[in-house]
Every structure is written in structure tokens, then in C-alpha cells.
């Protein structure tokens, strides 16, 4: 079995980065962001995989991530699925094998790392705005994006939450939230809960809304002001509203172009960090 410690690797010239995408709620845009970010990285020569280990109530999210990475099978994107639109811990007759899910994710991490090693002699140069290049001879990092279900404390199995997933993987968090009134409190609560569980937060991504309210003008700045000092935190980023078809797999390529600049900023900000820790239990500290 491949362990998280084995895969939280950093050498002088090759890294594997694992990010857990968590929302401040369900339906806030995690899948759209994850899919577009994955496609952007792939288009720019970065070994990447985007997965949603747990999914319930419809396969639209799975299909979006499949399309983002070029027609992968469901088993390459999703570990556990239920038709019931409830948290995995509440789904009848389909108990979650949490350790099995971790082993499945680690096998994907190994595959991403192996793929990136195969690109070691190449220099990745993007063709569009914000394209990626080798910097100082450093190879592009392999990236695994693991999308959670619901919020950070959404239950997955007995005694296990989405936070437990991040702890088991030693992943950095990307917090995705809707840019609307109320988001400041939701983001601060999520970050506080993450910190109490020993989880690092890489960045916050605010997703534009169809009908922007006045708060959207200041939410990002106020979140920056009120967040506590966080080791390794790279910033708050704003995604524009991409239209009612943002979750349409057929629009992935078009939408990546629309948000190419901010995707490049997020990648450049988040990729240069030390290795994550692992083995932290899902209990508040301090």
C-alpha cells in the first residue's frame, strides 16, 4: 500500500502537490473550479488529476470532472456514489469505506507522480495568458485536486468528516465560497475549523454570482483583513460569474480562457510550498 508519507514528496526539482477543495456549503462552485483548474493545468503541461471521491444525488459533478480531464472513466474520478442526495454518512445501504477511499486516492497520487516524472526532461510552456514555464530549472509540480462533498465538517462515515480526508492525505485546503452577502462569516468559520484540526489553507476562491450584491465589492478585501495569520496562506482570489452554463462540460474550454489569468495566479501562488504533514487526527487542537 502506498502511504501518504511516501507521496508527500519534495525534491530539489520535482514535487507532487495535493489540494483538498472544500466549500462553505454545498452547491457553491467547487466542481466548476476544480474542473477548470484541472483543464488549465493539463493544457499547460502539468500532470494533474481531479477527483470527487464521494458523490451523492446525481452524477453531474462526476461527468464534469471526467470531461475536464478528457473522458476518464467514472472509476478514475469517483470512489463512492449514491443516488440519494444526502451526506455519505446518512446514505442507507452504502456504508463508506473511508480507508478504502484513502487507498484509492493514494493510488491516483502515485499515478500522477509517475506521469510527471515522465515529463522531467520537458519544459512546459503555456500558449495562453499566464502560461506556465519551468522556473530556474524546476520541473512543473504534479497536482492532485481532491474535491470534498459539502463543507469541511460534512460527515463521511462514523467519526470521519471531510476534514478527516484532508488530514489523512496531508493536503492543503482550497476553500471555495460564493461571493455574496454572508460569505465572510462562512469563510472565517471554515478556516478556523481547519486550523483547529491542523489543516493548512492554501487560498480562498470566491465564485461570482449571477446577481452580484453590494457585498461582492468588498468581500475579498474584508476576508483578507479578518483572516488570522496563516502559515502558507497564499491569498483570496475572485472568479467572475461564468453564466448559467458554467457547469456544462461542453463549455470547459471556453470558460478556461475566460478565467485563464486568475487560474494562473492561483497556480503560481500555491505551487511553491513545503511538503504537507500527515497523520493528524480529526480533533480540534489547543
Regions found by a protein language model. Name each.
Residues 21-34:
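Glycine-rich phosphate-binding P-loop
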Residues 88-118, 137-156:
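Phosphate-binding/switch loop-helix module in NTP-utilizing enzymes
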Residues 50-52, 174-177, 202-208:
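Short internal beta-strands
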Residues 192-286:
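C-terminal lobe/tail of nucleotide-utilizing enzymes
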Residues 32-99, 104-108:
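N-terminal phosphate/diphosphate-binding loop that engages ATP/GTP or pyrophosphate donors
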Residues 2-15, 106, 110-142, 272-286:
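Intrinsically disordered, low-complexity terminal tails and inter-domain linkers enriched
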Residues 159-179:
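Inter-motif core of Ras-like GTPase G domains
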